[in-house]
Amino acid sequence: MERYESLFAQLKERKEGAFVPFVTLGDPGIEQSLKIIDTLIEAGADALELGIPFSDPLADGPTIQNATLRAFAAGVTPAQCFEMLALIRQKHPTIPIGLLMYANLVFNKGIDEFYAECEKVGVDSVLVADVPVEESAPFRQAALRHNVAPIFICPPNADDDLLRQIASYGRGYTYLLSRAGVTGAENRAALPLNHLVAKLKEYNAAPPLQGFGISAPDQVKAAIDAGAAGAISGSAIVKIIEQHINEPEKMLAALKAFVQPMKAATRS
């Protein structure tokens, strides 16, 4: 959990925002997935947002659903995902690692057991996409017991009550939604979020990272100009994996070429 705090402090000192890529663990297979993650970090990722393949991904658009299917086809299990997380943490001791997932995966293991496992492998945060703030108590309590930051989604239409709850319960960072709907790079993010950012700041929320529809450097810059601490990009990255599925080396080169200008856009 402290890794987020030190990251944001360092970025602030360097006058930079955070660029955070999302990928599904095990897509398109364990070995290549680990290479992908190394490449993202080498290209300038400040933190990682990682998905665990799940059979019913509600908030995911087709691009990320396909990533899940590829990981399933490779036979990737949640247990293997945790082994991967331990390897990533060993190799990259300081980068914040977040999980973005669904409640069923937490229930399958048992809530406390799940967060204990996260702590053991070095996961810093968990966002459970299908658990609203008002039902989050057992999750966030277990998370905090195990020094894992509970992450909450702040939708564009959040009212004052919700903003206060997110500020009060969230740690690590706040996932600022560019718009409602499913994820996807086709639907470009285009909402001025200044008012939400100002409110979150007023209520001392964890730093907001803008996600959903972030696929170009100008959007990263716009998010930071609106006061966000950085931006999360998922579908655009997963699409690159899909496009080069049979050319592993080309895939890594294309990912590097995508991430470098996205990170560059965080520097004011």
From Swiss-Prot:
Catalytic residues, chain numbering: E49, D60
Family from the record: Belongs to the TrpA family.
Record-given protein name: Tryptophan synthase alpha chain
Gene3D superfamilies membership: Aldolase class I
Source taxon at top rank: Bacteria
Pathway per the UniProt entry: Amino-acid biosynthesis; L-tryptophan biosynthesis; L-tryptophan from chorismate: step 5/5
InterPro entries per record: Aldolase_TIM, RibuloseP-bd_barrel, Trp_synthase_alpha_AS, Trp_synthase_suA
Entry keyword set: Amino-acid biosynthesis, Aromatic amino acid biosynthesis, Lyase, Tryptophan biosynthesis
Function of the molecule: The alpha subunit is responsible for the aldol cleavage of indoleglycerol phosphate to indole and glyceraldehyde 3-phosphate.
Record-linked CDD domains: Tryptophan_synthase_alpha
Pfam families xref list: Trp_syntA (PF00290)
Enzyme Commission (EC) number: 4.2.1.20
GO MF entries: tryptophan synthase activity
Enzyme class: lyase
GO cellular component terms given for this protein: cytosol
Catalysed reaction, written as an equation: (1S,2R)-1-C-(indol-3-yl)glycerol 3-phosphate + L-serine = D-glyceraldehyde 3-phosphate + L-tryptophan + H2O
Quaternary structure (record): Tetramer of two alpha and two beta chains.
